[in-house]
């Protein structure tokens, strides 16, 4: 099976963030700021992995300034469900070299 195809439940290989991934990250930025009680001046999606579930989980590495990164998990429901994007998990105090993993 090619690495760029998604297997249900499996994580894809890490890929450079696209404008769509940046938009997803930006959409849940306020949810993350509320949960971490921090304001992120910089919020630049760098890379991502995705996972097909009953919708799609996006694991996104976000550069938040200096040497600081956060990993966010965003759930995108199936189109017919018409639900907003949900920040379903996050990891703070990450570095540029920390690998994105399922969490």
Swiss-Prot record:
The keyword Cytoplasm applies. One of its GO terms (molecular function) is cysteine-type endopeptidase inhibitor activity. Pfam families: Cystatin. GO terms for cellular component: cytosol. SMART domains: CY (SM00043). The record marks 10 as: Reactive site. A motif (Secondary area of contact) lies at residues 51-55. The keyword Cytoplasm applies. Keywords: Cytoplasm, Protease inhibitor, Thiol protease inhibitor. CDD domains: CY (cd00042). It is found in: Cytoplasm. This is an intracellular thiol proteinase inhibitor. Belongs to the cystatin family. PANTHER family: CYSTATIN FAMILY MEMBER, CYSTATIN-A. This is Cystatin-A1. It comes from Sus scrofa.
